[in-house]
Amino acid sequence: SKCYNLNKTVQESLREVHSKFTDTLSGKLNFSIPQREALFSGSEGIVTIGGGKYSVLAYTMIKKLRDTGTTLPIEVIIPPQDEGEDDFCKNWLPKFNGKCIYFSDIVPSKPLSDLKLTHFQLKVFGLIISSFKRIIFLDADNYAVKNLDLAFNTTSFNDTGLILWPDFWRRVTPPAFYNIIGSSIDIGKRVRFVSDDISPVSRYDPFVSNSNDYTPKERQEHFLKHVPLHDLDGTMPDLSSESGQMVIDKIRHFNTLLLALYYNVYGPTWYYKMISQGTAGEGDKDTFVAAAHALNMPYYQVRTKFEFDGFFYQKDDYKGLALLQHDFEQDY
């Protein structure tokens, strides 16, 4: 196995550019709440990315939403390369209190063509250009199994404004990323055991209870050798994040979305590989939690791991069909 290694010169260059961008967010782009609200005409709704096969998937996802009683309006974001789906957008979608939002109607053509956005990068752009102030984002192949109308009237959402769900894989974001965003990690303070940040640390790490019996050097060696990086104070929580569903207050987390956009624009060059180290699922999925963490904005990631659904085709031949994520408010 190999460790992610980003030399100090590159780290410093990335840190400097990152700092300039976050300074811009807190300066020129630090819009007031009324200014942010004026950018979005809608109130609350559901957003998904369509276009091509994703519009076909969105068709079944939207029917499922209505079957479960969800009445929130829906916006399907259509990327530039997939415009022209008139029957879906103009005839079918309005029957389900939905409409299409075209990139080309909102984003000027030259910046859009210059950016050369790929699939992963389209999602955060879609979240920003949707007209709603508060959104439930769902991937087109994501099916709600309960009514989502009350999602915005929950304690967890009101406390944080950003709800995320865990992925299958452990978080492997390297120290280099934390150096770039200017976030310090306390290598002498363990705050969780994977996703469990409620139980006393001594329950899963007896060393902590007896730490006074050891020298400072021995304590440091213990944390460096035996404690995962993302169990330490100052890091993003384990597990890694999944972006197939998110609940976002775009007014409160306006800068979070802009920084996530920054990570995605420079994702193929730097941040996708850096944040996920080439593991399965590398892409936009961890850029949202990374942006909130970098800006010290509140967020809640569901602690309960997802479950698999599927069947055994033959003995010892399990066919996975779906992932089942948990109710975020019950988890909170």
Please give the residue ranges for each predicted region.
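Glycosyltransferase catalytic domains, chiefly GT-A lineage
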Residues: S1-Y332
